[in-house]
Structure formats: C-alpha cells, structure tokens
Amino acid sequence: MKFIIKLFPEITIKSQSVRLRFIKILTGNIRNVLKHYDETLAVVRHWDNIEVRAKDENQRLAIRDALTRIPGIHHILEVEDVPFTDMHDIFEKALVQYRDQLEGKTFCVRVKRRGKHDFSSIDVERYVGGGLNQHIESARVKLTNPEVTVHLEVEDDRLLLIKGRYEGIGGFPIGTQEDVLSLISGGFDSGVSSYMLMRRGCRVHYCFFNLGGAAHEIGVRQVAHYLWNRFGSSHRVRFVAINFEPVVGEILEKIDDGQMGVILKRMMVRAASKVAERYGVQALVTGEALGQVSSQTLTNLRLIDNVSDTLILRPLISYDKEHIINLARQIGTEDFARTMPEYCGVISKSPTVKAVKSKIEAEEEKFDFSILDKVVEEANNVDIREIAQQTEQEVVEVETVNGFGPNDVILDIRSIDEQEDKPLKVEGIDVVSLPFYKLSTKFGDLDQNRTWLLWCERGVMSRLQALYLREQGFNNVKVYRP
C-alpha cells in the first residue's frame, strides 16, 4: 500500500532552506509514529510531498488514521501506483478502479501531471472523462459540484490512481518550533490550548498543580497522555506534577479573600517558570480566555504576567466557551473534561476583577515563599510514556455513606470562612471542623479510634481528601453525602 502525504500550505511558502528543514522534520515524525505499526515501512521525502509505503495490509486503517493526526500534514492520498503506456491505458485503468463508484452519479476527472509527455493534464481529463461517460451509462459528467471527483496523478511513466483522500490536521511539524510547558488542569481550556500549540509545531510538556490528591492527578495524567498519544507521540515529553496543597493552605490562612484568585495564579506562574527554566523551556501555555473568570481580566492577567520573565502564551484568549467546547469535542478531550472534578477550595466570595499591584504585593508579603520553593523542588517529573502503565494501577477507593454508625464523626473540611457562613449542624452526631488544607498535617492528631466522615458542599473536595488520607494509610475515613 502507498500513501502520498501533502504538506500544509504554509510550509510550501517558506524559503528553500526552511522548507527542506520542515520536510525533513516531518519525515522523521512520521517514521517515529508509524514504526509501532509496521517496522518495515518506508518513508521517502520529496520536494512537494512525502511517500509512505508499507507491506502489512492489516495495518492499512491504523496507519491512515495515524497520519491524519500528525501535525504538518494537510491531507493524505491513498493511492495505487501502476505503470502506463498511453492515454488509453490510463482510461482503462481508471475504468476498472472507478466503475462501481460512478454508477448513477455525476462526476468529473481532475489530473495532475509531472514529467515529459506528449499530452497535457487537460487532454487526459477530457479523454478519460469522455471514456468513462461512454462506458458507464448511468453516469454523467458535471464539472461543477459533481458527486464524485476522479483524481489521477501522472508522474513520468507511472499512474497514481487515488483511492481516497483524507484530511490531516495541518499546522507545522512538531519540533520546528521551540518547546513549551502547558499548565494543564484536565478541563476544556487547557486541553485545547495544548493541542493548538502542538499543531503549531511545539513539543508540549505538561505541568499539573495538584490541589486535591491522587485521584485528580490520575485524571489529568490521562488527559495529557491522550493528547500526547493522539497528536504528539513523535516526541518524548515530560509530565511534571507539583503538590500545591501547602501553597493553597498558606493562601487561605494568610491572604485577603478578594486577592486570593490572582495571588494563586501568580504563585502558579512563579512555580511553572522555575520548572520551565530547569528544563530549558521557552514559554508557558495556559487556557485562559479574556473575561471568562475574575482572574482573567486584562488588569489581572497583566499582574499575573508580571511575576515572571517567561513568555506566557494564551491561544484561547479571544475564544468563547462554546467554541472551546466544540474544539474539545473535535480533538476528543470533551468527555475527560466533563468528568474531571472541579476544584472549589480557593473561591473568593468577592474576587477582585481589577487588582491593584500595591495591594497584591502587600498581601504577598504575608506569604512564606519557602513553601513555594519546597513544592517546586519536590515536583514529580515523569516521562509521559510511563503514564499508561501507571494509570492502570489500582486506584484506592473510598466508601460514600449517607447514614451514621455509633462510632462516626462528621469532619467538616470546608474553609473557615465557609464554615462561619454556613455552619453544619446534623442531629444525633458530632461535627468537628478541620479545613482541608490542614488535613495532611493535623488529621493524625485526631482520635484514630473513631470513623471520620469527610464532608463538603459539593462532595468533590471531601472525596479527593478521603482518597489522599487512605493513600497515607488512614483506613478510618469515608465520605458523607446526605
């Protein structure tokens, strides 16, 4: 079998040296991706296309599908390459190939020709089109908007009968641009923004700020692995997970409510910039869209950018949510995003939409930056190829209950402000307060002979924290959902 790879048009308008470099990189990317399907396949580059030849017919569909997801490819032609002698021979071969497709349909013939011949492309179109029209009674020629277009390519003494055309994702080959670090949360925005930078030729590494235990991290790892495996598997990339719970706890304890959102984002950018510098990455990528939430106003984004010299790319800055969700659906991350737990631990009651630099800096003076340095230093860095094996490992489960036993105690893990606003009172059972950001250090001080039922309003944080405690060896925890 043979495929002809057509280049993304923006590649073809580059200077000769740049075009050759892009084609060389794309050829290498294709080899890296397809070697898993057929180690004997051949990938041959030309000035205006790339040929892929493979022997294993059982892998035809898999190879074709993989090619449509490699950045830099405009479209793929599945072809049959045969010799020919003259125009009548071309017609006879086209008749055998296309007769069944043209029965009862309107059609036209389009020919591309390279080499020296005693006929032109138009001559072949007329001859083959007239012959097909005569020999297939139910078919008729229609040059504009036909139901079937017969594509033929003539190159020297070879005829390419095009059996199918399949659209690629376009863009530039990965590796033609410099590396970036995507701040991925597993939601709609960060997945789409990561894809857009891969499509533009960047090798995308991933940085995840873990705010809620292993279950959340496993979900985000699956999203990152899916994106890499589907669109970027030609290159090795890193997945860096940073345990940000200590940072969140420090913010909740010391920072003014209205400034929390902006300061949390500033801390994330600081941490991600340190990671980027460590690995020689040139830019950060976020899924922020202008005005989508309070921290994404121009004033706040400018303040967030100010904490780092690292370039921050926001490919979705002018996109609305519906457009982003549609893109997520196209690339296959929508289902991941819909089921991803939404972290609700740092939500200000009255977040500022126009933060003042002096106020932000004054609040940050209360923050212990050694905590930030420590979590970055302890960041977990893994090769994304290892994630598939790791996520297959059994995840600790936690029981959810809606009633009480004689030894049970409800543990309200909401922030102090939330508890003061809406105190939890349940008849017939004790309620103890311990904010989620103190669980890792204070839960061990509680009476371990009791069974602790973790509770928060949405049930997301309580489940994540219960999973975390189970992983730490505390088996006396459950989730309370009335």
Curated annotation (Swiss-Prot):
Active-site feature positions: C456 (cysteine persulfide intermediate)
GO BP terms in the entry: thiamine biosynthetic process; thiamine diphosphate biosynthetic process; thiazole biosynthetic process; tRNA 4-thiouridine biosynthesis
GO terms for MF: ATP binding; CCA tRNA nucleotidyltransferase activity; tRNA binding; tRNA-uracil-4 sulfurtransferase activity
Catalytic activity: [ThiI sulfur-carrier protein]-S-sulfanyl-L-cysteine + a uridine in tRNA + 2 reduced [2Fe-2S]-[ferredoxin] + ATP + H(+) = [ThiI sulfur-carrier protein]-L-cysteine + a 4-thiouridine in tRNA + 2 oxidized [2Fe-2S]-[ferredoxin] + AMP + diphosphate; [ThiS sulfur-carrier protein]-C-terminal Gly-Gly-AMP + S-sulfanyl-L-cysteinyl-[cysteine desulfurase] + AH2 = [ThiS sulfur-carrier protein]-C-terminal-Gly-aminoethanethioate + L-cysteinyl-[cysteine desulfurase] + A + AMP + 2 H(+)
Domain THUMP: 61-165
Binding site for ATP: L183, I184, K265, G287, Q296
Enzymatic class: transferase
Disulfide bonds listed in the record: C344-C456
Ranges where the Rhodanese domain occurs: 404-482
Protein known as: tRNA sulfurtransferase
Source organism (scientific name): Escherichia coli (strain 55989 / EAEC)
